[in-house]
UniProtKB/Swiss-Prot annotation:
Organism superkingdom: Bacteria
Keywords: Cytoplasm, Queuosine biosynthesis, S-adenosyl-L-methionine, Transferase
HAMAP family reported for this sequence: QueA
Known function: Transfers and isomerizes the ribose moiety from AdoMet to the 7-aminomethyl group of 7-deazaguanine (preQ1-tRNA) to give epoxyqueuosine (oQ-tRNA).
Pathway the protein contributes to: tRNA modification; tRNA-queuosine biosynthesis
Pfam families membership: Queuosine_synth
GO cellular component: cytoplasm
Known partners and oligomeric status: Monomer.
Protein name per Swiss-Prot or TrEMBL: S-adenosylmethionine:tRNA ribosyltransferase-isomerase
Organism of this sequence: Acidithiobacillus ferrooxidans (strain ATCC 53993 / BNL-5-31) (Leptospirillum ferrooxidans (ATCC 53993))
Length: 345
């Protein structure tokens, strides 16, 4: 299966550069993978589209202000983008500087703390802090929100709120689980009143989510690692939804990948650890009955995931429809609600 099979043409004008004034005001393309059909709707229609007894599974990761402007001891500028924290004082960062960083070098951070380069792997460096210093306060005080590269503007103060879900609780992500950005308290309340239940998983989205697929044969793509947790509470909520005949609706590809990782043995079980799960056409889904997601980049692993879920022909045709109808694409863009093709559950 080739990378070029997942290409589509997208005018730059359709890439959303800022959020809508209201979170739930986005459009929503409802895609039926079994029938191969779609219809235009709005995110605010969700309470009427979902059924009492359905279960929404949301990712409660919290995006860190993960981009830091730092300096070498010589005064040279270093831009750091957190990939993942290993513990309170240790983490991997993507580093950009005029000259390569080397193990043993000191990096001067906003606020005066000094980190040490411990390891280097390509453009990634592992940085450690002294025993009395932690990364989270440094990032919160001196970092900026890590907007994706296709948003061609500097992060603003408002992005600290809008590039974050209203239910974000567990710090650790460097990119938002963007399907969740559409939910405001009014929409969540309306869904609860409808009888739609909700539960949470955690998947800390890493910087690797923006890495392109470089191999022409997509099965050779090395998937990046991300830390995640599916709790016993969530496993019980999924079992209860099944027992009452409800559907399990993953809010975002991150929630979907977390659920499917925890069900790799065929049964959903509590799971804490790393995932490198890559879902592409031919793979099956053990848990996910429906998927709410944004529109994804051409030839990306996330587009491959939704093609696996709803079928390539249906999904790529739905994308062409969305382009023709002027939908807004990517992180701050519109949404899709997808049901699976036959045999994918």
């Amino acid at each position: 299966m080739h990378k070029k099979d997942f290409h589509y043409e997208l005018p730059d004008a359709l890439i959303a550069q800022a959020p809508l004034p209201e979170r739930s005001a986005a459009r929503m393309l409802i895609v039926d993978g079994h029938q191969g059909t779609w219809e235009d709707a709005w995110v605010r229609d969700l309470p009427g589209v979902l059924r009492p007894g359905d279960l929404l599974v949301l990712n409660d990761t919290r995006v860190l202000p993960a981009r830091l402007q730092a300096r070498k001891t010589t005064g040279g500028a270093v831009e750091l983008l957190l990939d993942r924290l290993l513990d309170a004082r240790d983490g991997w960062f993507l580093a950009k500087s005029s000259k390569a960083l080397r193990p043993g070098m000191s990096i001067h951070l906003p606020g005066g703390a000094v980190a040490t380069v411990e390891e280097k792997d390509g453009m990634d460096v592992r940085l450690s802090l002294p025993a009395d210093v932690a990364w989270l306060p440094i990032l919160e005080a001196g970092g900026s929100m890590p907007l994706p590269p296709y948003i061609r503007r500097a992060a603003e103060a408002s992005d600290r709120e809008r590039y974050q879900t209203v239910y974000a609780a567990r710090p650790g992500a460097v990119a938002a689980p963007t399907a969740g950005l559409h939910f405001d308290t009014e929409l969540l309340d309306a869904l609860a009143a409808r009888g739609v239940e909700r539960t949470f998983v955690t998947l800390h989205v890493g910087a690797g989510t923006f890495l392109p697929v470089r191999s022409e044969d997509i099965t050779e793509h090395p998937m990046h690692a991300e830390t995640m947790e599916v709790s016993a509470t969530t496993v019980a909520a999924v079992a209860a939804a099944r027992a009452r005949g409800g559907r399990v609706i993953a809010v975002g590809t991150t929630a979907c990948r977390a659920l499917e990782t925890a069900a790799q043995g065929g049964t959903l079980r509590p799971f804490t650890g790393e995932t490198r799960l890559f879902l592409y056409p031919g793979k099956t889904f053990q848990v996910t009955d429906g998927l709410l997601t944004n529109f994804h980049l051409p030839e990306s692993t996330l587009l491959m995931l939704v093609c696996a879920f709803a079928g390539m022909e249906c999904m790529l045709a739905a994308y062409r429809h969305a382009v023709a109808e002027g939908y807004r694409f990517f992180s701050y863009g519109d949404a899709m609600l997808i049901s699976p093709q036959a045999g994918r559950r």
